[in-house]
Amino acid sequence: MASQEDPVQREIHQDWANREYIEVITSSIKKIADFLNSFDMSCRSRLATLNEKLTTLERRIEYIEARVTKGETLT
């Protein structure tokens, strides 16, 4: 009877080891996904800020070009 329990016990231990391994992998994947989502939000925010600054600069350039074209002084 003991010889029959040994393989069963080994299978149970192996099953638990596999489950723990799967849990570690799953947890790591979740952490990576959380990081990537956070990184995405951060990049989008920074790009939006940069876009606003570029738009402001483009408007200033257009204004200055218009004044130069009309021959006005910039002061």
Curated annotation (Swiss-Prot):
Keyword set, alphabetical order: Coiled coil, Cytoplasm, Cytoskeleton
InterPro entries: BRICK1 (IPR033378)
Record's GO cellular component terms: cytoskeleton; SCAR complex
Localization: Cytoplasm, Cytoskeleton
Coiled coil location: 41-72
Record carries keyword Kinase: no
UniProt GO BP: actin filament organization; cell motility; regulation of actin polymerization or depolymerization
Keyword hit for Coiled coil: yes
GO molecular function: protein-containing complex binding
Family from the record: Belongs to the BRK1 family.
Role played: Involved in regulation of actin and microtubule organization. Part of a WAVE complex that activates the Arp2/3 complex.
Record protein name field: Probable protein BRICK1-B
Taxonomic path: Eukaryota, Metazoa, Chordata, Craniata, Vertebrata
Gene that encodes it: brk1-b
